[in-house]
């Protein structure tokens, strides 16, 4: 009888231990494991479109496309299935077409360091801009009011512009004039896609909370499309394995136990990637391809947003 009692006690202790361990691996599906946020803000930045002589590496052309105070809407949905893990989906998009600016410089002479041709296009619109980001965070260090860890994710970002009208100076000032007002000259779009790694941190004191995030990628693939409407030419470029750096910080205050108002600043830098270019003649249908480092694609941008976060 005594042996049976001991056996029952051992089975009970073992079962409780197994249950406790298995419970650690059961994801939290309660509503308070889910957090969502919505914010509005502005986007600013600049993209560069470059053309090179593949034989000498000399820069032949550079177009600077600016983004100026474009209104954005940003959303975030995160789930914390375990105390040491957070799954997150977030993104932002322009709310409408916005203001931009474009300057086009050409270096047609190898015998002079300065540009030979320039056109300026103040009437440039940002047709759209958007980004989405899917990531997972693993919290390696946790305390009562802080946590820090690593992150990995996938991100895609897109921009599009149209330049109309403008003025030009060609052949070192030999030809000076204006393009027809309101007529499309050049349309340009970029797309960046990449996996990334990074570091994340969170700190809270009373009702104040601050979050920081650093992201890095050495595996950026970039695509662009350049439509020269007046010349009826299309230029398409693709680059691989360029670098990206990103950082964001947000600070907020809990107005209730579940709701927080916050402001965020986020910065992204896509370093120049170089690759081949395809040229399509829209009139004849002829195409040509130049391999090597014939073209370059780059962008840097930042957003400033403010909004509301809610934990269910």
UniProtKB/Swiss-Prot annotation:
Compartments, record wording: Cell outer membrane
An example GO CC term for this entry is: cell outer membrane
Keyword Glycosyltransferase part of the UniProt annotation = no
UniProt-listed InterPro entries: OM_adhesin/peptidase_omptin, OMP_A26_sf, Peptidase_A26_CS, Peptidase_A26_omptin
| Top enzyme class | hydrolase
Q: Please give, as recorded in its UniProt entry, the membrane topology of this protein.
A: Multi-pass membrane protein
- Provide the primary localization: membrane
Per UniProt, which keywords does this protein have?
Aspartyl protease, Cell outer membrane, Hydrolase, Membrane, Protease, Signal, Transmembrane, Transmembrane beta strand
Q: Which intervals of the chain form a coiled coil?
A: none
Report which superkingdom the organism of origin falls in: Bacteria
Task: Give the range the annotation lists for the signal sequence.
Answer: 1-37
PROSITE patterns assigned: OMPTIN_1, OMPTIN_2
A Gene Ontology biological process in which this protein takes part is: proteolysis
Q: Gene3D superfamilies per the record?
A: OMPT-like
- Enzyme Commission numbers on file: 3.4.23.-
Provide the active-site residues from the annotation: 104, 106, 226, 228
Q: Which Pfam families match?
A: Omptin
Q: Which GO terms describe its molecular function?
A: aspartic-type endopeptidase activity
- What family is this protein classified in? Belongs to the peptidase A26 family.
Query: What function does this protein fulfil?
Result: Protease that can cleave T7 RNA polymerase. Specific for paired basic residues.
Q: What is this protein called?
A: Outer membrane protease E
Q: Which organism is it from?
A: Salmonella typhimurium (strain LT2 / SGSC1412 / ATCC 700720)
Gene (UniProt): pgtE
């Amino acid at each position: 009888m005594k042996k049976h009692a001991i056996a029952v006690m051992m089975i009970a202790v073992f079962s409780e231990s197994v249950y406790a361990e298995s419970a650690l691996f059961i994801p939290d599906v309660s509503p308070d494991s889910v957090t969502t946020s919505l914010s509005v803000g502005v986007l600013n930045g600049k993209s560069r479109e470059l053309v090179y002589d593949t034989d000498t590496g000399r820069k032949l052309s550079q177009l600077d496309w600016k983004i100026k105070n474009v209104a954005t809407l940003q959303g975030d949905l995160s789930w914390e299935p375990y105390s040491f893990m957070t799954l997150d989906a977030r993104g932002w998009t322009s709310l409408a077409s916005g203001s931009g600016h474009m300057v086009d410089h050409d270096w047609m002479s190898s015998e002079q360091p300065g540009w030979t041709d320039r056109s300026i296009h103040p009437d440039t619109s940002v047709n759209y801009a958007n980004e989405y980001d899917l990531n997972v965070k693993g919290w390696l260090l946790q305390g009562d009011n802080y946590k820090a860890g690593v992150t990995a994710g996938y991100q895609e970002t897109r921009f599009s512009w149209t330049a109309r009208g403008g003025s030009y100076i060609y052949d070192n000032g030999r030809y000076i004039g204006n393009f027809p007002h309101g007529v499309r000259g050049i349309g340009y779009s970029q797309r960046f896609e990449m996996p990334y790694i990074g570091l994340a941190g969170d700190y809270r004191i009373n009702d104040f909370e601050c979050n920081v995030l650093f992201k890095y990628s050495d595996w950026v693939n970039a695509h662009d499309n350049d439509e020269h409407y007046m010349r009826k030419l299309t230029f398409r470029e693709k680059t691989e394995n360029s670098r990206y750096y990103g950082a964001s910080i947000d600070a907020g205050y809990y107005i209730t136990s579940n709701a927080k108002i916050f402001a965020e600043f986020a910065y992204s830098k896509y370093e120049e990637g170089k690759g081949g270019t395809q040229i399509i003649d829209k009139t004849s249908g002829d195409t040509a391809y130049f391999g090597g480092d014939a073209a370059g694609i780059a962008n840097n941008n930042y957003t400033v947003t403010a909004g509301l976060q809610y934990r269910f």
